[in-house]
Amino acid sequence: MEKPVTGFSIRYEFGIFRQKIVDGWQMEFPDNWLEMGDVWLHPRKDDAVEVRFGGQVHEWMDGGKFKTAQTGYQSVIAVPHDLYISGYNSTAVNKLTLWSASMPQSFDMNAFSRGDYVRALEQNTMAEAISKVLYPADDHINGKRLRLRQQYLLVSSSLQSILNEHLKNYHTLDNLSDKVAVHINDTHPALCVPELMRLLVDEYDYGWDRAWEITCATLSYTNHTVMAEALERWPVSLFQEQLPRIYSICQEINRRLMEKLQRVYPNDPGKWNYMAVIANDEVRMANLCLTCCHKINGVSQLHTDILEKTIFRDYYNLDNSRFLNITNGIAYRRWLCQSNPALSGYLQTLIGDGFLKDANALEALEQYRGDLDVLENLRAIKRKNKVRLAAYIAEHNGVNVDPDSIFDVQVKRLHEYKRQLLNVLYILTLYNEIKDHPEKPVFPQTFIFAAKASAGYYLAKQIISLIVAVSNLVNSDPQVQGKLKVVFIEDYKVSLAEIIIPAADLSEQISVAGKEASGTSNMKLMINGAVTLGTLDGANVEIRDRVGDENMFLFGMTADEVQALWQRGYDPHQFLTPELDRVLQMLTSGALGQRFDDVAASLLTPRFGAADSYMTVADFESYKAAKKRAVEVYQDRTRFTQMSLANIARAGIFSSDRSVEQYAKEIWAL
């Protein structure tokens, strides 16, 4: 795309984790990212920068100028490692800079000489921990501390590098916002706001007002979630301990914000508190971005609407010119051309290779909607991919699945709002139907799950255990053989997704409406010809706009209906059918080989917050009807393949090329 951009992240030694299912329970093991990949990285030790943690901040006035000094801090050295990335058929090469952390002196010789061998290495070990593991568990204070240190290392080292490079070229920072756009991708790099202020004020002697003007004009922010727990908030005590100067800057940002809000909303302390950067002993990362950034966007139209009308409404009302939507996109050359070469190659014989550069050229496939030979060839390619996945499942799960069955696929991280539980409850309902009426013909169905749960997320891990228990029950029951199979494929990752996604017939996108910001698995599956079965949530709404109701299977309440039901007072017992009640009793009776009391309780009691927080029970009957409808349509092979073709042809809008172009024009001014 010929865009002059650089990405920044951390050079993690280990990924999130390798997942193993042991006795039905997710176990986490180290996933060494550098073992094979470090060869592609180019270290630049001469461009290392210092990042400071802890200590004390001293402030004073000197000749009318505000001055600060930080003492007693821990110094960490961040070393950049560059990965060069070329585009498809492009002259541009972009750079991804990854930072590793270490101490200025990796070895304390004095401690070693005293015989204190552990202390001789301790400080360096603590520094290196910053770049050790992606997303360390944060359900304890040490995990929170490490995550905060990771975020500040990324932000401080990256901004120092950006300013150093800018000064080499222009010898001034006055024009920073004219030449540089810094984009905050979700709240993890939100510390860009106070860190850029620190650099401008403390290191380059700008006054506060001019520094704030530059910072606001330089920074922009994409929000990726409406989930409260993902809108990061740091305890003041932890924040102040680790980042004392950054905390004092946040205090000043908050003080000035409060002065403004008290002028605009003079009698509304509730609004002041909700919009505050610091309140209730927390530092709020999203509000930090909302206070500062010149552009703020959501990642689907529904998501942006929800941000503007609810979560960020007060900031939107204060200045709506900063808000816009840019729907997510996918790297379709990976997810179609690389992952599904048979389909990509066949499309080139039909419509040429123009779609390799312009995804919208896929629309030319529409002309073949009535061509029975083309439809047959598309089915043959899909079956070939299903045979490949079936072979993987046989090898890794020891389960033989029928490639002529429907491959009903739900692949994404495990979270209650994504409602893998809704899917597995339906499977148990179907299992009971088959057991009750063995004489009734049932079209063969294979349900395929792959998901990782966060290491500290108990209920998500319980749901994985439930899926595994259901798969053991179903796959070992001779009465349902040839009709029903359930598979949980462990250790979901990109390379595994490249095998699963091209083989999918149905794409499960079943989050409760209003909770999924966008989703991208829906787009990856769509461009590979899977037909979406989903709610009107996230980018599903825009998929529906592209393909129409007739080319997907919709169910469930809308976001407005969900909100209205909560306001009326939602009681899941009012939606509980005898059929679903029977399934929930199976969870607590031991019929699955173990009890899942907590999973059942999460739906019917307030043990884990509101009963059925994600309205699984309320949407169950609608979901069941959509599943039945999908199976019925699938048996009309021509009709279903036409739906598949329509999804491929109309998926071009969801290319990351389009979304990046929007960012470049509408936010970065490239």
Regions found by a protein language model. Give the residues of each.
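A conserved ligand/cofactor-binding region detector
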Residues: 1-670
